[in-house]
C-alpha cells in the first residue's frame, strides 16, 4: 500500500475566489492593432465598483471563471485574457458606465461570427454582478476582417448586374404577408414590377406554409419577373426567401432559385442564425445570386437602451457573415431609427473606412480593408411624401422599399409602383439640379404629381399619414 500523501497548506496553486479586477482590469494596457475592441454599456449592481464590473465582463467573455482553477497554470493568461482597459461614466446616468475591453485575436476562430458572438455576447450577459449590459460597438481589426468573405457581391457588382446607376433602387414587400396562394402572389409581384419597381420581396415570415409552398411561389414569381422584364426592358428581381428549418433545406431552395435564373434570394439572418447565413452567402457568391437580408428579431436584441446588442454591432456582423442588402430602419417611417444613429451604422455598412464619431454612436475607427459594402434598405411605413427625405438621408446607394405605400394605392399595385417611381425620379432630378430636398421636398412631389395621375392619387391618400413617436434608442 502506498503511503498516505500529506497535503500542506500553501503548496500547489492558491485556490479560492479573488476579485476580477486584480487580473482583468488593466488601465495601463496599450491596445494592439490586432485586438478586437468592445465598448459595453454596463449597469453594475448596487455596491459593485465599476472597475470590478468591467473586469468581470472582460473575464467572463474570455478566459475567466468564478474561481481560481489549477489549469490556469497550463496556459498563458497574459496572452489570452480579455482586458478592461478603460471605464468612463455615461453622462446623465447615475450608475452606468462604458467599459472598453480588448480581446486578443487568437481567442476567435477565423471567419466565424458564431464563435465571435458566443464569447463576447455569451454567458456574460446573465452575470449576477451586473444589472444590465449592452454591447454598443466592436472594432474588428483588419487581420480578422480578412478571414471573412463578406457580402456575396457588394454594391458595385450589384449595380453592374442590374445595369442601374445614379439613383436608389425601389422595392415593395408583397402584402398581405400571409394567406395568398402562389398564383395570386405571383400576380401581385408582376403588377408591381411592370409598374416601375426594381424589386419585390417575400415578407420575412413567408417560408413554405400550407397555403403557399415554396416551390410554387418560386415558380410563379419567376414567371412574373420574366414577363415584367420583357415588357419594361429593365432587369427585375424578387427576394425569394430561402430561410428554412435546416441549412440543407435552405440551400436546396437557393439552388432552385439559381436554376430558375432569378437574380436574388433572401434570408432572415437572426432567426436563421449566423452559421446558416454565412453558408448561404458563400453559396450565393459561388453561383451568382444576390442576397437580401431581413433582420427579423433584431428589436428583441437591440431596442432596449441598457441591455442587449446595438444594431450597429449586428450590422457589422452581417457585413462579415455576408449579405448584399439589409434592412436598416427609415428615420421617417413607422419603425425605430434615430437619424444620426441610423446614418452611423449605414456608413458602417457601405463605406470602406469609418472614423470614430461618438456623436453618431461610433466608438471605434473601423477599416474594412476593401470588404464589399452592403446596401441599406429603408422599409416600414413609408410612402410618396417621404421620398424627398429618404433620397436625401440615404443617397443613391440604398433600397427604398414601399409595401403598403405601393399596394395601398387606390388604383392597384401597378399604379402604386408608378407613383413611387415617378416620385423617386423627380427627387433625383431635383437633387441633381441642386435643389434642397429637405426644404423643397413637398413642392417637388406636388410638381411631379401634375404630370402623373398615379402620383397625384397617392399624394391624396397619404397626405395625413404620420408616425410621430419618439425613438427609444437615442444617443
UniProtKB/Swiss-Prot annotation:
Chief subcellular location: plastid
Textual note on the cofactor: Binds 1 Mg(2+) ion per subunit.
Post-translational modifications: The disulfide bond which can form in the large chain dimeric partners within the hexadecamer appears to be associated with oxidative stress and protein turnover.
Keywords: Acetylation, Calvin cycle, Carbon dioxide fixation, Chloroplast, Disulfide bond, Lyase, Magnesium, Metal-binding, Methylation, Monooxygenase, Oxidoreductase, Photorespiration, Photosynthesis, Plastid
CC terms in the record's Gene Ontology section: chloroplast
UniProt propeptide residues: 1-2
Modified residues (N6-carboxylysine): 201
Annotated GO biological process: photorespiration; reductive pentose-phosphate cycle
Modified residues (N-acetylproline): 3
Keyword Acetylation: yes
Keyword Signal: no
Site (Transition state stabilizer): 334
UniProt subcellular location: Plastid, Chloroplast
InterPro entries named among the record's database cross-references: RuBisCO, RuBisCo_large_chain_AS, RuBisCO_lsu_C, RuBisCO_lsu_C_sf, RuBisCO_lsu_fd_N, RuBisCO_lsu_N_sf, RuBisCO_lsuI
Residues reported to bind Mg(2+): 201, 203-204
Signal peptide: none
Superkingdom to which the source organism belongs: Eukaryota
Family as reported in the entry's similarity comment: Belongs to the RuBisCO large chain family. Type I subfamily.
Functional note: RuBisCO catalyzes two reactions: the carboxylation of D-ribulose 1,5-bisphosphate, the primary event in carbon dioxide fixation, as well as the oxidative fragmentation of the pentose substrate in the photorespiration process. Both reactions occur simultaneously and in competition at the same active site.
Name used for this protein in its record: Ribulose bisphosphate carboxylase large chain
Annotated organism of origin: Chlorokybus atmophyticus
Gene, per the UniProt record: rbcL
Amino acid at each position: 500500500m502506498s503511503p498516505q500523501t500529506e497535503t500542506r497548506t500553501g503548496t500547489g496553486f492558491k485556490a479560492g475566489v479573488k476579485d476580477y479586477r486584480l487580473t482583468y482590469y488593466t488601465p495601463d494596457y496599450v491596445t494592439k492593432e490586432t485586438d478586437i475592441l468592445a465598448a459595453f454599456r454596463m449597469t453594475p449592481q448596487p455596491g459593485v465598483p465599476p472597475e470590478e464590473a468591467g473586469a468581470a465582463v472582460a473575464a467572463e467573455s474570455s478566459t475567466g471563471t468564478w474561481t481560481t482553477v489549477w489549469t490556469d497554470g497550463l496556459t498563458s493568461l497574459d496572452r489570452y485574457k480579455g482586458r478592461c482597459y478603460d471605464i468612463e461614466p455615461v453622462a446623465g446616468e447615475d450608475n452606468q458606465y462604458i467599459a472598453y475591453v480588448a480581446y486578443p485575436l487568437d481567442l476567435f476562430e477565423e471567419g466565424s461570427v458564431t464563435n465571435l458572438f458566443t464569447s463576447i455576447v455569451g454567458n456574460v450577459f446573465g452575470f449576477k454582478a451586473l444589472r444590465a449590459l449592452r454591447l454598443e460597438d466592436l472594432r474588428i481589426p483588419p487581420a480578422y476582417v480578412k478571414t471573412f468573405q463578406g457580402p456575396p457581391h457588394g454594391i458595385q457588382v450589384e449595380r453592374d448586374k442590374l445595369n442601374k446607376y445614379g439613383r436608389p433602387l425601389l422595392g415593395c414587400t408583397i402584402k398581405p404577408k400571409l394567406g395568398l396562394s402562389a398564383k395570386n402572389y405571383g400576380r401581385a409581384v408582376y403588377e408591381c414590377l411592370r409598374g416601375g419597381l426594381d424589386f419585390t420581396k417575400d415578407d420575412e415570415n413567408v417560408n413554405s406554409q400550407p397555403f403557399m409552398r415554396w416551390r410554387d411561389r418560386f415558380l410563379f414569381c419567376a414567371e412574373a419577373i420574366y414577363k415584367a422584364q420583357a415588357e419594361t426592358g429593365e432587369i427585375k428581381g424578387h427576394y425569394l426567401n430561402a430561410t428554412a428549418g435546416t441549412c440543407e433545406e435552405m440551400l436546396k431552395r437557393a439552388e432552385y432559385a439559381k436554376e430558375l435564373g432569378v437574380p436574388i434570394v433572401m434570408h432572415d439572418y437572426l432567426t436563421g442564425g449566423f452559421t446558416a447565413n454565412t453558408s448561404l452567402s458563400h453559396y450565393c457568391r459561388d453561383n451568382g445570386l444576390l442576397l437580401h437580408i431581413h433582420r427579423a428579431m433584431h428589436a428583441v436584441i437591440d431596442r432596449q437602451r441598457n441591455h442587449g446588442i446595438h444594431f450597429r454591432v449586428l450590422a457589422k456582423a452581417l457585413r462579415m457573415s455576408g449579405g448584399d442588402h439589409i434592412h436598416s430602419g427609415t428615420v421617417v417611417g413607422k419603425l425605430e431609427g434615430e437619424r444620426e444613429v441610423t446614418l452611423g451604422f449605414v456608413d458602417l455598412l457601405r463605406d470602406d473606412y469609418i472614423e470614430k464619431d461618438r456623436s453618431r454612436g461610433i466608438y471605434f475607427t473601423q477599416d474594412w480593408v476593401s470588404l464589399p459594402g452592403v446596401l441599406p434598405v429603408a422599409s416600414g411605413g413609408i410612402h410618396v411624401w417621404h421620398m424627398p427625405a429618404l433620397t436625401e438621408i440615404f443617397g443613391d446607394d440604398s433600397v427604398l422599399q414601399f409595401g403598403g405605400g405601393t399596394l395601398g394605392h387606390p388604383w392597384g399595385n401597378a399604379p402604386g409602383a408608378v407613383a413611387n417611381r415617378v416620385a423617386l425620379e423627380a427627387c433625383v432630378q431635383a437633387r441633381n439640379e441642386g435643389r434642397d430636398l429637405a426644404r423643397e421636398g413637398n413642392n417637388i412631389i406636388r410638381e411631379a404629381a401634375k404630370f402623373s395621375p398615379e402620383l397625384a392619387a397617392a399624394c391624396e391618400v397619404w397626405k395625413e399619414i404620420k408616425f410621430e413617436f419618439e425613438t427609444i434608442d437615442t444617443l
